[in-house]
């Protein structure tokens, strides 16, 4: 708990430093209406609250407006295809989305390579080998454990294998049918272990699951309230409850875990001016300033940049991420979810 308290204190200090600096810079132009020197368009599949917090912070500091357009993954690919087929440079300059979408866009030729000093600092596992995209954040699946359970049990499950072997434990998790981050865990385990072993792990875990929740935050709240002993949850939601002083400790599966990785790519056929502005913004997303902008709105995504203070002071920075990418077609995903329903959730011997 002390490690997370230090994380929160340091984040608060960083927020104060940025706030003081911003207040000083804005005092000279107080009363004057500011107009952005430039603006460009970015496609994103992230929640509007996240993109809005980033855009507001960036425009306030650099007077450049990022016009985010929220779209689904398929809609983004459709827009990029149309832009790629156009005869002139127009439309979006940046894509801010999950790794799978960026990989698909790169293969289709909808992105152009971008190399920078900031991007070079990111581990190879978080970026495209030919630099068509660079990861900026990741949100892993972790074990959120109630502190009372910790005090009464010595054999803490710190791996999927151990969790599957536990008997005296109440588990909470989000329904694989309810959220992409949750179903991504199932697909990732299948990609990493194979179908047989992945389903066997979940068959053993199933009897201890008290409830499948609809939302990502619900299992974390249940662990904090003592309604379950351990929840399988996304770290971003877990850190929100840790920040609110819920009695939760985070355990990172030592045998690996899934993570949603978010990154940036520069769109093909963006104008040279917009592409350059998008590159500068993409680099800014790899800074502590961007992390502070997110933390001020209670978004706790982990940065991929090891040179930032945010990364260096976080205790879970060495978490092991599954190596194999969970890329399945929509039809394959439907089949896997249907099998999970029949062979795990509602399976009767």
Could you describe each region identified by the protein language model?
Residues 112-118, 132-134, 161, 246-258, ...:
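Short beta-strand->loop
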Residues 139, 171-177, 201-206, 212, 244-268, 284-307, ...:
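Periplasmic-binding protein-like
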Residues 7, 21-104:
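Early extracytoplasmic/lumenal segment of secretory-pathway proteins
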Residues 144-149, 261-274, 293-294:
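A bilobed periplasmic-binding-protein/Venus flytrap-type ligand-binding module shared by bacterial periplasmic
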Residues 45-49, 74, 89-92, 96-220, ...:
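Extracytoplasmic ligand-binding site segments that recognize negatively charged/polar headgroups
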């Amino acid at each position: 708990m002390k490690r997370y308290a230090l994380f929160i204190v340091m984040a608060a200090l960083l927020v104060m430093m940025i706030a003081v600096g911003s207040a000083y810079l804005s005092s000279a132009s107080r009363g004057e209406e500011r107009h952005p020197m430039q603006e460009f368009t970015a496609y994103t599949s992230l929640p509007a609250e996240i993109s809005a917090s980033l855009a507001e912070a960036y425009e306030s500091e650099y007077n450049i407006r990022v016009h985010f357009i929220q779209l689904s993954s398929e809609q983004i690919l459709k827009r990029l295809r149309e832009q790629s087929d156009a005869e002139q440079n127009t439309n979006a300059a940046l894509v801010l989305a999950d790794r799978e979408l960026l990989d698909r866009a790169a293969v289709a030729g909808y992105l152009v390579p971008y190399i920078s000093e900031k991007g070079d600092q990111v581990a190879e596992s978080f970026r495209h080998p030919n630099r068509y995209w660079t990861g900026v954040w990741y949100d892993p699946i972790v074990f959120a454990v109630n502190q009372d359970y910790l005090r009464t049990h010595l054999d803490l499950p710190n791996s999927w294998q151990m969790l599957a072997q536990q008997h005296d434990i109440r588990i909470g998790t989000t329904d694989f049918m309810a959220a992409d981050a949750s179903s991504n865990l199932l697909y990732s385990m299948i990609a990493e272990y194979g179908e047989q072993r992945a389903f066997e792990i979940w068959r053993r875990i199933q009897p201890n699951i008290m409830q499948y929740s609809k939302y990502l935050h619900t299992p974390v709240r249940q662990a904090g309230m003592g309604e379950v002993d351990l929840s399988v949850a996304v770290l971003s939601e877990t850190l929100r409850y840790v920040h609110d002083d819920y009695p939760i400790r985070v355990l990172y599966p030592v045998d690996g875990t899934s993570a949603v990785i978010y990154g940036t790519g520069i769109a093909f056929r963006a104008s040279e001016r917009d592409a350059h502005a998008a590159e500068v913004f993409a680099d800014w997303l790899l800074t502590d300033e961007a992390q502070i902008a997110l933390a001020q709105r209670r978004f706790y995504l982990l940065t991929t940049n090891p040179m930032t203070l945010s990364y260096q002071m976080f205790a879970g920075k060495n978490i092991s991420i599954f190596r194999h990418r969970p890329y399945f077609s929509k039809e394959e995903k439907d089949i896997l979810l249907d099998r999970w329903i029949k062979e795990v959730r509602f399976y009767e011997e």
